[in-house]
Amino acid sequence: MTLVAITYTRGSLHILNQLLLPHQTTYDPLHSARDAWHAIHEMRVRGAPAIAIVAALSLAVELHTLATSNQLSAEPKDVGQLILEKLEFLVSSRPTAVNLAEAAGRLGRIVNGRAQVQGVGGNEVAEAYIEAAERMLDDDVRDNRAIGESGAKWVLEHAITKGSISGTGQAKVAVLTHCNTGSLATAGYGTALGVIRSLHATGSLERAYCTETRPYNQGSRLTAFELVHDNIPATLITDSMAAALLARQSAGPAQSVGVSAIIVGADRVAANGDTANKIGTYGLAVLAKYHGVKFLVAAPRTTIDMNTKTGADIVIEERPEKEVTRIRGPRDGEEGNGLGAMETITVAADGIGVWNPAFDVTPAALVDGIITEVGVVEKDGSGVFHLERIF
């Protein structure tokens, strides 16, 4: 059964509440752009592609409701202005992820173009927006599968390590990933986790390793949930164990293949290849370089921001202190009776200062390739990415 995080039919949108995973599976309805803003900001939905799609579809639902109840203006410019204001509001929910801003800009241009057509009414402008937002859902799944296939092929061609041939003679790889980049972070299949899924589908994956990803634990809560759901051989490690994992030739249950590649997603890729992603990504890239392990970024072209020249220009979101000092989960059941009620506990000394950036920036010099839906972009002989060539 395929894991579905976003369910949509015209006029109806539900998201899988990721704050409750892996212990509860609850779908929250979103009726408006305001509902989506709160869901994104509270991280009930997260992942750069997913938040862009949820934001776009939430406004589609709101517009459909207004149109069917005759509450939309007949004036196309008024409806266009309403849509642009709602899109601007949605972008403010998580400023680091470029997909959201890119989608808002693209949808805004479609709306402006439709509103300027002579004889068009307000409902038709809304309809143009709704159709464009709905296409985003289908396009993302298609793009993710292409990313998975391209990435898997590149890894097998470039990242096979000594000892990576199984007893059957088939090349197999072990891959480490960070945060969550699967069906929960996209419309489906995933980016970095999509590569892992593609490797597994062809029998080429020995084992996937996922980091816990403190402080929000997207790895232990979400990626581990997806890997178990898909019956992919996987091992969870804490963030601080990554260096030790790369340093040894074998690790984990039934493991005989050293890690060949670290594959991560991205929230924004600058024009030069500098990559903003979940905090801890930069450290993994440094470790990969030291240990001679390939480091790959998997992201659709919508994540590449050609208007941002380098990573120094990327705004890094900072999250509340309590995300570091507290942790939430169900009470462990007594005497094998399962899980108890959800509780929040404190894990830090009272009064300690906290710095909690949600993302860091990995320099392009540490990235071996950027996996997109149109192929893997590598650096030229002088170590420079030419990302403009894929647009």
UniProtKB/Swiss-Prot annotation:
Q: Does the keyword Nucleus apply?
A: yes
The enzyme's E.C. designation: 5.3.1.23
Gene3D superfamilies the record matches: translation initiation factor eif-2b, domain 1, Translation initiation factor eif-2b, domain 2
Q: Which InterPro entries match?
A: IF-2B-related, IF-M1Pi, IF_2B-like_C, Initiation_fac_2B_a/b/d, M1Pi_N, NagB/RpiA_transferase-like
Which pathway does this polypeptide act in?
Amino-acid biosynthesis; L-methionine biosynthesis via salvage pathway; L-methionine from S-methyl-5-thio-alpha-D-ribose 1-phosphate: step 1/6
In chain numbering, where does the site feature Transition state stabilizer fall? 179
**Where in the cell does this protein reside?**
Cytoplasm; Nucleus
Entry's Gene Ontology cellular component terms: cytoplasm; nucleus
Q: What is its main location?
A: cytoplasm
Its job = Catalyzes the interconversion of methylthioribose-1-phosphate (MTR-1-P) into methylthioribulose-1-phosphate (MTRu-1-P).
Q: Does the keyword Transport apply?
A: no
Q: Which residues form the active site?
A: 267 (proton donor)
Provide a GO biological process annotation.
Answer: L-methionine salvage from methylthioadenosine
Entry's HAMAP family? Salvage_MtnA (MF_01678)
Look up and give the organism this protein is from: Ajellomyces capsulatus (strain NAm1 / WU24)
One GO MF term on file is: S-methyl-5-thioribose-1-phosphate isomerase activity
> What is the recorded name of this protein?
Methylthioribose-1-phosphate isomerase
Origin organism lineage: Eukaryota, Fungi, Dikarya, Ascomycota, Pezizomycotina
| SUPFAM superfamilies documented for this protein | NagB/RpiA/CoA transferase-like (SSF100950)
UniProt lists the family membership as follows: Belongs to the eIF-2B alpha/beta/delta subunits family. MtnA subfamily.
Which transformation does this protein catalyse, written as a reaction?
A: 5-(methylsulfanyl)-alpha-D-ribose 1-phosphate = 5-(methylsulfanyl)-D-ribulose 1-phosphate
Keywords for this protein:
Amino-acid biosynthesis, Cytoplasm, Isomerase, Methionine biosynthesis, Nucleus
